[in-house]
Amino acid sequence: MPDPATYRPAPGSIPVEPGVYRFRDQHGRVIYVGKAKSLRSRLTSYFADVASLAPRTRQLVTTAAKVEWTVVGTEVEALQLEYTWIKEFDPRFNVRYRDDKSYPVLAVTLGEEFPRLMVYRGPRRKGVRYFGPYSHAWAIRETLDLLTRVFPARTCSAGVFKRHRQIDRPCLLGYIDKCSAPCIGRVDAAQHRQIVADFCDFLSGKTDRFARALEQQMNAAAEQLDFERAARLRDDLSALKRAMEKQAVVLGDGTDADVVAFADDELEAAVQVFHVRGGRVRGQRGWIVEKPGEPGDSGIQLVEQFLTQFYGDQAALDDAADESANPVPREVLVPCLPSNAEELASWLSGLRGSRVVLRVPRRGDKRALAETVHRNAEDALQQHKLKRASDFNARSAALQSIQDSLGLADAPLRIECVDVSHVQGTDVVGSLVVFEDGLPRKSDYRHFGIREAAGQGRSDDVACIAEVTRRRFLRHLRDQSDPDLLSPERKSRRFAYPPNLYVVDGGAPQVNAASAVIDELGVTDVAVIGLAKRLEEVWVPSEPDPIIMPRNSEGLYLLQRVRDEAHRFAITYHRSKRSTRMTASALDSVPGLGEHRRKALVTHFGSIARLKEATVDEITAVPGIGVATATAVHDALRPDSSGAAR
């Protein structure tokens, strides 16, 4: 463990100007990024008295082996550079505000020809507009069920849409008027996009005009004695009002604001955000984060770090055209103002494209809403602590059990496991999964297409394990020897750290093969074991007999979870490769024919069989297909009649 005194900058060498600094560990990996008004004042605080630092900060300075800094002109520049580096390097000691993917949102795929409304979970994508998040998926489905009476937009998947377009018959929703059936041409693309635009306007808070329009149409139908239409419009109006009731007005001035609240203890903080648009709560998000423990850290620093990371991420994905969809609202309400509130507001204004106000609510509706958000944060932290206490105890017991059973010097905080999957030597793939502190770290998972140990219907599981192991640790050695992280190709350095425990799915042959590769590469301090499936035996290299861990052992249970996760990950990738191979089309081999034009041909003719019967002139009629390409397609599908049919 490095001594902070060994890399402490010389007195007077640190500039007093504002800037951004980076701590690196002994492998050259950036482990912390921070900024300061005065680099000298901030960095000196890390080395003045290490014993008096907060536990997490003390761990930071004793893990680091080097500190670097970059001087900037203003604090706004420092904010931007800090955000960029945190995104690029993903430092382990920085607070990580991961968007909670468990929260469902209502997504509108505006990038498609016929936009779709759907329930969605996952990372944000360009070309898609999001409403929410909602606390439950059923709440979105209930909202969609109400609103598609009035805004009959498409909700089906691409496969369902394509199938009904081919059979020229709408689905059930089309028959009951909950979909405008663009698949069969009941409305064209422009008309459908207008329906979707009205739907988005309604969810954005522009509700009154739709209610007034429906009421006017209902009254007009009644005056014309068209009571059936009037009854249908009455039901539509009722559905619209029920949807409006679900979004009560919380801010009487109809403002757009995000209300942020924190609840924290010595180690962690709960963050809650209510997104208010047009005076109504449109969504809620929550995070639990580890506090960085930086000198003088407090709620003020949490506010600054959260706003920088959250709005930086949201603005990076924003392509909204209208005001209500802007991810940065006019007003951000926080529990306390950070020390650089003016610079932060300026930076947020730059992201938004117009002025953003950063303030603490003092009275009225905004104060009441802020208190509600704070209560939500307190409840979230309390629930997390109860769950964390039981989970942490179980994980600690599992890691301790593995350490004791295998005779390791330390608990295996990072465990990696490899597995191989194939069917009779075809589509041979390997997988590597990573568990840190007993939890899966999915961002570090990797697939491997086996190159040397398999092919042409042959597969050697032992050689495949050796190949995956060699590629994994060669990557580790390469990352370790090149600490320059600033070049774009060095951004992903997930394997700069070696695992404490390397697990292979198999018995003595597999574990001996992996161990031989690791020894050959000169990698030390990595324990290697194999976990055999049938009797759950733990094999150690060069040992004639396995280790038998107790069946009720928490350690064995964790190893089984790791092994099963590697198996699941390998099977998933294998099935994907096999499916791709089995569904390969005869069009794939046509030179100059890309995926877009292949889809256009199949869509136009309905199937490969019909395309085979087409002449060159008929193929040329497809938009984007020229004579040369049509001839190549014709000859590829009907090689026996090349040049005959025109």
UniProtKB/Swiss-Prot annotation:
Subcellular location: Cytoplasm
Keywords from the UniProt entry: Cytoplasm, DNA damage, DNA excision, DNA repair, Excision nuclease, SOS response
GO BP term, pick one: nucleotide-excision repair
PANTHER family found in the cross-reference section: UVRABC SYSTEM PROTEIN C, UVRC/OXIDOREDUCTASE
Molecular function terms from GO: DNA binding; excinuclease ABC activity
Main location: cytoplasm
Subunit record text: Interacts with UvrB in an incision complex.
UVR domain sequence ranges: 208-243
Function, in words: The UvrABC repair system catalyzes the recognition and processing of DNA lesions. UvrC both incises the 5' and 3' sides of the lesion. The N-terminal half is responsible for the 3' incision and the C-terminal half is responsible for the 5' incision.
Family under the similarity heading: Belongs to the UvrC family.
Keyword presence, NAD: no
Gene name tied to this protein: uvrC
Name of this protein: UvrABC system protein C
One of the record's GO cellular component terms: cytoplasm
Keyword Lipid biosynthesis part of the UniProt annotation: no
Family matches, as Pfam families: GIY-YIG (PF01541), HHH_5 (PF14520), UVR (PF02151), UvrC_RNaseH (PF22920), UvrC_RNaseH_dom (PF08459)
InterPro entries xref list: GIY-YIG_endonuc, GIY-YIG_endonuc_sf, GIY-YIG_UvrC_Cho, Hlx-hairpin-Hlx_DNA-bd_motif, RuvA_2-like, UVR_dom, UVR_dom_sf, UvrABC_protein_C
